[in-house]
Each structure stands twice: as C-alpha cells, then as structure tokens.
Amino acid sequence: YEELKKYIPMVKILQVGQGASAWKDNLSSFTSLTNAASSPRVVLAILNTASKDNFIEKLNQENLIFVADEVHRLGSKKFRNIFKIDADYRLGLSATPERFRDEEGTKAILDYFENKLEPIYEIKDALGKALVHYDYHVHECLLSFEECEQWNDMSEKISKAWNANGQEESDGYVALLSQRAKIAKKAESKISKATSILQENYDEGQRWVVYCEEEVQMEEFRIALKEEGIDSMKFYSEMPLEAQKGTLEKFENFGGIILSIKMLDEGVDIPSIDHALIIASDQNPRQYIQRRGRVLRKSDNKQKAVIHDLIITPPSSETGKVCNLTKTEILRAINFNKNAINEMQTKNVLDKLAKKYNLDLNQIEEKDDFNNVEEDLTED
C-alpha cells in the first residue's frame, strides 16, 4: 500500500482481505470503467480472498490488468479458482514459477499467463546491481546411527507406498515423505554445529537470520546460544504482530540474530540481513532461492552477504539409503553455490564430501533435477 502511494501518488486503492471489508459493497463500482477514467485505481487483494467466487463475481473485468506476486502460489488447488478472472493483461511475478512436484499446478499457471517474458532476469544478472554478491559455506552434519535406522525404516515404507501407487501421490505417501524429511531437518548434531558456527563467525552489529525447522528446535538453539553468552531473538508467525514489529525494529537498529522458521521465506523483507545460517531446509528449490534472495537484498553499507548451510550426511558410506539423502543435500548446495564469490573453493569442499560417500559430484551436477533426485529417494 505504502509503495503504491509512494510511486503513484494519485492512485486510489481499494484494499481487500486482512480485515478490510468495505470492498464487498464497493468493488463493483470501484472497478467500473466510468470511475476508472477519473484516476488510477488499484485493487490490492490477498490471494485467499481474491480467489473466492464472491470477489470474482463483483470484479469488473473489462480493461483489467491482473498482477500476481509470488505467482507460484496461484497454482495450488486451494487458489486455482483465481484463474476465472478473465483479464486482458496478465503479469505473474516469481523467481520460481514452476511448482515443486506439481505438474498440474505448474501447467495451470503457464496456461493462464501463457508466456515467460524474455530475456529471463536471473540471479547472475542481478548480482552487483539489485543484489549484493555473496560467500557460501557448507558444513557437514552427521546423522546418528539411530537417525540413520529411522531414515532407512521410513524409506522402506515409502518404497512400498510408491510401488503400490505408482506415480500417484496419495496423502499417505506424501505424509511418509514429510515424516522422513523431518529426521534430517531435526538431526541432533545440527544444534551443536550451528552453535559453533556462530561462536566462530558472529560479530556484534552483524545481522544474522537462522532458519529452523520448528519452534522446539528454535528454542533448543536459543538456549544453546544463551549458554555460550550469545543473545538471539525469535521470529515466527504465531507471535503477536506488535512483538514481531518490536523484534524487527531492534534488529534494524542494533543488529543481532533472528531465529526464524518459515516466516521469512515469503512476505517479510529485511534488506539489512547480511548473514544467513540454514539449519533446516526443504528440497524444494523455491525455498533456497527465496532464502538466498532475502539475504542478498541491497542495503546501506552492505558490501556482501554470507550464507552458511548445514549438509546432512550419514556416519559412514555403508548406511544404506541415507547416502541418497546426501546426494540431494549436495545438489541443493551446488545450486546455492552457483555465482558465489567463493564458488570454486566451496565446490572443492563438495567434491571431497561426495567422494567420501562414493558419489560423483559431476554426475549430481549434470542431473541437476530435484524431481529426479526425489525419485532416487523414493525408489532406492
């Protein structure tokens, strides 16, 4: 809202959703061609409301420009109804318009918006212009033998579910994938490794964001840091808005360490962040692209950003199906590492790590497809 007013001072804005209810009576007249001719008009709507029939039916769709931020979200079954809006002009914005492991949703997006604008503006084009350059460091994190056993047991169940369902992903199958992923995300060794990284690298005045899996892990890490004399602040969606605002103001004014779950993946913009520590990460490329983008935003006196990433590995190369997990972890790191200042140094680290587990870094890099690697995890 504030940005629209800043760049288009004469614009009239009708807000929809998040407590705004006046639109229910005014949307039809606000978007009529008669009123639109008097001044620039924008309907600023949240997706949850804009995808409902009662919004679409009241919206005058003549001479309409439809702009969708984070357009990948529109392809979900929950929001796909929004494609009923028959706008003459359509623009979808996203660093990752393809939906992870959702061909139907991706097709719905591409069918509606039809074409990708060329040339595609990639991260390599933005570095040094809209984004700062960055260093990328990986840190090996070992699963315990017990965690490896849990992973292998879950893999057996997933393999049976895959064989039973073929390509169709039942709710039970997806739930098994999620349960197995949490074993890696919540690995016990991550807290001690992350604590040591901050002990060695954090300096007062820096602005760090740490991505955790859940509140329990976030609190465990906060306590571990406190025991080492390092203060941190929690930031998550269930916090009261005033508390969130206070945390961000303190962070902007004095720096520090914010512990977050997924709250900073979309929607919260803090350009002053100069360091990121990734404790928990999905295999979904959208997540690492968004996280990298959050850290690389330009800010006053910010010369570059630094990203630390925890890579999960088994305790030995003979621990069964867990080695395929390491393959996906390395693939994520390969993609994160592209265009980093220290790309060659980190690539050497990844190469040594791959060889340790009888993996070929070049083969992993050539495959470079999370959907196919996910099949490795499923069928092994």
Can you describe what each PLM-predicted range is?
Residues 69-70:
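Walker B catalytic acidic pair
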Residues 116-216, 220-227:
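Interdomain linker/hinge connecting the two RecA-like lobes of the SF2 helicase core
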Residues 21-36, 55, 207-209, 217-226, ...:
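Conserved helicase ATPase core of P-loop NTP-dependent helicases/translocases
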Residues 318-380:
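Long, largely alpha-helical accessory region at the distal end of helicase-like NTP-driven motors
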Residues 73-133:
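Post-DEXD/H (motif II) to motif III coupling segment of the RecA-like Helicase ATP-binding lobe
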Residues 44, 74, 231-341:
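Conserved RecA-like P-loop NTPase helicase motor core
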Residues 1-23:
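Conserved helix-turn-beta segment of the N-terminal RecA-like "Helicase ATP-binding" lobe
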Residues 22-65, 76-81:
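Conserved helix/coil segment N-terminal to the catalytic DExD/H
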